[in-house]
Amino acid sequence: MENEVLKAIRERRSIRRFKADQITDEELKTVLEAGTWAATGHGTQEPFIIAVQNPEICAQLRKMNAEIMGVESDPYYGAPTIVIVLAPESNVNGVKDGSLILGKMMLAAHSIGLASCWINREDGMFASEEGKKLMKDWNLPEGLMGIGALALGYASSHPHTVKPRKEDYYRIIK
């Protein structure tokens, strides 16, 4: 069976090399809106999606993430846009909800010709005092945790062909 959605799922790859060119507002809004259509437990829509294009704030996020990772390189691979997903610490489905949002946004990005890569360590970043200050500056409520982020932009190179899926990846029990 084949259709546009299944084709996009099979073709999307994590990209780790980005052009410096900023994406358009229309492209950004398309990706962000796709995230809002992700399923959330009990339909709560509690996560927050924060797109950062301000160069100074992006630099701060890169530094925070790199410090947690213990590297000096850019954990966001030079992407001009960083999209952060946060969820209430009190929501038992927060990580699941935020993960679905990130997945939908990655698929949407691919479908309109953008590149993305899931980035980790936002949990540690936004548990820190520096992260809490950023959330306050962004007028977000207290009690949020970082779920993950996307490096988002135009690919400067494309990955090699994908390896085949392992044969025992799924099982059908009848």
What are these language model-derived features?
Residues 1-174:
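Acidic, surface-exposed loops and disordered segments
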